[in-house]
């Protein structure tokens, strides 16, 4: 379905309430009544929470990769400029002579902290809400840990209400 949407073979039906109903409709058209089972042991609440976490996880991974590339470039420039001397400033005044490489490595240290923050955020965010349903779980015998592993999550939400309502990771 995603490939068909991306290629233009399929257009979103704005008559559907949201993307979840659209996907269910297309699956039902393509597979018959079994497509209606997509919603079994699922709620839009846990699906939206899942989608948001998966989206942000991918964005964090993308940003992490970009920061690593920048870090490598900064370190390479520091290596290439080990003997370049320039004035160091404090209070808008020249203070001491410093090496350009030392100045660049200050930025490398900042980028390393940023990588740590991104990693910490990813750890807290990479919790799977699937199975929380609307807010109180499901009576269907689902294997939440299996689903979480298959979707690339490190853990499952320990509390179903928190699983569908938690958005503090977005602030990070």
Language-model features and meaning:
Residues 1-137, 141-157:
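A helix-coil-helix interface module used to build multimeric assemblies
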């Amino acid at each position: 379905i995603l490939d068909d949407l991306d290629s233009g073979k399929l257009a979103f039906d704005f008559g559907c309430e949201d993307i979840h109903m659209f996907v269910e409709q297309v699956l039902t058209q393509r597979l018959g009544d079994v497509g209606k089972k997509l919603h079994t042991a699922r709620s839009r609440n846990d699906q939206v929470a899942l989608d948001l976490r998966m989206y942000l996880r991918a964005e964090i991974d993308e940003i992490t990769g970009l920061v690593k590339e920048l870090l490598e470039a900064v370190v390479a420039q520091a290596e290439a400029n080990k003997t370049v001397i320039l004035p160091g400033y404090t209070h808008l005044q020249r203070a001491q002579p410093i090496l350009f490489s030392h100045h660049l490595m200050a930025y490398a240290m900042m980028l390393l902290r940023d990588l740590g923050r991104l990693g910490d955020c990813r750890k807290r965010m990479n919790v799977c809400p699937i199975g929380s349903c609307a807010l109180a779980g499901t009576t269907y015998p689902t294997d939440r840990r299996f689903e979480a592993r298959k979707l690339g999550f490190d853990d499952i939400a320990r509390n179903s209400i928190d699983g569908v309502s938690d958005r503090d990771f977005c602030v990070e």
